């Protein structure tokens, strides 16, 4: 274990003079800061981290201050302290283990996904009254062009052509919600004793359509090839995706797949590369494209 950053020591010391750093939890890739586990004097268990940038810090603090309450009592960590200048946060721990590290019996796994759908439905209502500027087709076209220039060299030509085709038109304009931004099993804590799911890591939470990341990532990384979990998740969410949402998910997923592939290769995040490949494979199957032929570093 390396030394916890001094900025995090200062943040914890703003809460208590007596504490113990018990573990460092590295995150995938070569630029994401570690998460630090800290024990307080009264048996408290906290996690602290230094955000990689001010936007991530602002998003996570906003989510804890305004949105996570919609999940219900005990369904997410609580913000203990934060410092904007040092981009540090300290949050309470929640019971359970990350779902992506567990191998649950099929019925338990379906229950977990149903609860994940229910919690996401609640979270998507948290900012119902907050305004959000609508994206324009011009900004979408610019985003697509920038991404293609930056990432096309890492994917086979047939995948690049597929992404161009899927992103040719801007996604349907959908209602904005408070999205989690990385709503995947790695951020779902499953307590086997309680048979209860909780949600962590809100640094990518922002006002976007539900299809932008929350639905598109889950759909094309997992649910496309797990119809049982797809049914359980949407039962918990309360409804299936509309045709417009499905269309938007496809367009967003196409760009996200290339972006994730590029980021994973550049930052040695093999898990993210694998997830990007899965997204491309599922998009190919959905659009009738040819079998994946490999990626280029």
Regions found by a protein language model. Give the residues of each.
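Active-site activation/catalytic loop segments of kinase-like enzymes and analogous catalytic loops
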Residues: 213-241, 253-270, 281
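Helical subdomain adjoining the active site within ATP-dependent kinase catalytic cores
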Residues: 259-297
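A glycine-centered beta->alpha junction motif in the catalytic cores
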Residues: 91-106, 125, 144-150, 254-271
